[in-house]
């Protein structure tokens, strides 16, 4: 956590990385696209050098649950502006329950703080908890407004859980681009939008994610750290956004999005693992 804060002092200008470094990553992505009949988008940003590389990085993909990082960052921002109290409580009603609410479904009739709702949705991807946050913020449009405020002109949130995960081809609602969300994470974790305390809390939630052990975490190089948030949706949507770093490697922000495939969730997970392994190899070989 301290290491990440060191890099929050300066965000360098972005420059396109030498594509030869990522030749294997691109090759792997193309092979996976063909084998799964999928659409894949990738973006990678080195926060120290400002170098970035992308594959279909400006094309749109369903946000799915990767929006939860942004919603909770908005909660932190509003709290810092004195516009919301993260310790305020919301009574949980049975009507609040939606598909996949492992934390909230056990607390019907009880109260939960907004802070705890963010912890629940960030660490378990609890959908009812996400809706509690969205309602407190003023709805999905408030998240989109926040994104525009911090310079993201592409990412948009239009619906709540679980409808936002529809993933229909050509539907602009609830979408992002790999490049846009990498830039947004860079601003939220290393920029000036949030205080250092806010950045640390957002990172803490991402580091303690409990539902991504079979994705990038499974191929993380020894001695590296990761803070991430994943998502899944209709029409084969699968995604992950992550920050990875080590003592020798400055933070790297990665986004991987899959869409429009009939592949199983296991095969989509495996695709993310293979792409992640190739990305990590680029940086681990540099630091040897």
UniProtKB/Swiss-Prot annotation:
The keyword Hydrolase applies. It is an enzyme of class 3 (hydrolase). Its EC number is 3.5.2.6. GO terms for biological process: beta-lactam antibiotic catabolic process; response to antibiotic. It catalyses: a beta-lactam + H2O = a substituted beta-amino acid. Transmembrane segments: none annotated. InterPro entries: Beta-lactam/transpept-like (IPR012338), Beta-lactam_cat (IPR045155), Beta-lactam_class-A (IPR000871), Beta-lactam_class-A_AS (IPR023650). GO terms for molecular function: beta-lactamase activity. Inhibited by clavulanic acid and sulbactam. The active site is at residue 65. Keywords: Antibiotic resistance, Disulfide bond, Hydrolase, Plasmid, Signal, Transposable element. The class A beta-lactamase family has a specific amino-acid numbering system, sometimes called Ambler or ABL numbering and often misspelt as Amber. A multiple sequence alignment was used to derive a consensus sequence and then the consensus was numbered taking into account insertions and deletions. This allows use of identical numbers, e.g. for active site residues, despite differences in protein length. UniProt always uses natural numbering of residues, hence there appear to be differences in numbering between this entry and some papers. PANTHER family: BETA-LACTAMASE, BETA-LACTAMASE-TYPE TRANSPEPTIDASE FOLD CONTAINING PROTEIN. This is Beta-lactamase CARB-4. It comes from Pseudomonas aeruginosa.
């Amino acid at each position: 956590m301290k290491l990440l804060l060191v890099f929050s002092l300066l965000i360098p200008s972005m420059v396109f990385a030498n594509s030869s470094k990522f030749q294997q990553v691109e090759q792997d992505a193309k092979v996976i696209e063909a084998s799964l009949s999928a659409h894949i988008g990738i973006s990678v940003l080195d926060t120290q050098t400002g170098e970035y590389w992308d594959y279909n990085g400006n094309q749109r993909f369903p946000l799915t649950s990767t929006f939860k990082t942004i919603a909770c960052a908005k909660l932190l921002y509003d709290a810092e502006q004195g516009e919301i109290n993260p310790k305020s409580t919301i009574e949980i009603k049975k009507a609040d329950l939606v598909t996949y609410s492992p934390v909230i479904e056990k607390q019907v009739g009880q109260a939960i703080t907004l802070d705890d709702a963010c912890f629940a949705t960030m660490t378990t991807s609890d959908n009812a908890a996400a809706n509690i946050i969205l309602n407190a913020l003023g709805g999905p449009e408030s998240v989109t407004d926040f994104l525009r405020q911090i310079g993201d002109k592409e990412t948009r949130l239009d619906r709540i859980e679980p409808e936002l995960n529809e993933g229909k081809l050509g539907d602009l609602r609830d979408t992002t681009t790999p490049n846009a969300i990498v830039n947004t994470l860079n601003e939220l974790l290393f920029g000036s939008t949030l205080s250092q305390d806010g950045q640390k809390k957002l990172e803490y939630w991402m580091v303690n994610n409990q539902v991504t052990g079979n994705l990038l975490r499974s191929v993380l190089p020894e001695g590296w750290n990761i803070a991430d948030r994943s998502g899944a949706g209709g029409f084969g949507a699968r995604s992950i956004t992550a920050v990875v770093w080590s003592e020798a490697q400055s933070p790297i922000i990665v986004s991987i999005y899959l869409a429009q495939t009939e592949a199983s969730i296991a095969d989509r997970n495996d695709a993310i693992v293979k792409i992640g392994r190739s990305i990590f190899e680029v940086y681990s070989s540099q630091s040897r």
